[in-house]
Each structure stands twice: as C-alpha cells, then as structure tokens.
Amino acid sequence: MVKFTVLPLAAMAALASLAAANNCKTGLNYCGYNLLGIGNYGAQINGALETASQPTDDGHIHESLFHCNGGNNGDISFISYCGAGCKDGGSGNSDFC
C-alpha cells in the first residue's frame, strides 16, 4: 500500500514544479499579450500599469512592454506603451516596441 501512495505524491510534486515554471524569465522584457500567454498575469499587468499611472484598457494591457523582475511570482514592472505595437522578440529574447 505504501508504494501506491508514493506515486500520487510524486505526480503532484511534478505538476507543482510545472505550474511554478509558468513565470517570465528574469531580465527579459515582455509584451503584455505574451505575458498573458505565459500564465495568469492579468492582475500583475493591471497592477504594473496602475503603479506607472497608465490606463488599464485592452490596448495598454496587450501592447505595453514589461520587464521581468523575477522572484517566486515572476514579478513585472511597466517599461513603456508601444503605440505602434509591441513586437515578439522570439524565444529566449526580449520583446520590443
């Protein structure tokens, strides 16, 4: 019976590590739309925009550039609004305006 309990615990630990991996990569810059695709960044994006005295409309949420400060929650800070659109820099690279 003990062996059957170990397997579910190991599976839960593996899933927890996968969930924790859905954060931005420290030091990279991200478009809002890419942060939303990575994980549950809606509240953090709104908070970063409000802290920077920026509007929280869809355009600013999706087309602003944010810096990944890192930490357990993948903390972010607002860099700028990309009026001409935010561009995906590709995997492992910073996004840009």
Residue ranges of model-derived segments:
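Fungal secretory targeting signals
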Residues: 1-22
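Extracellular low-complexity, O-glycosylation-prone Ser/Thr/Pro/Gly-rich "stalks"
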Residues: 25, 36-97
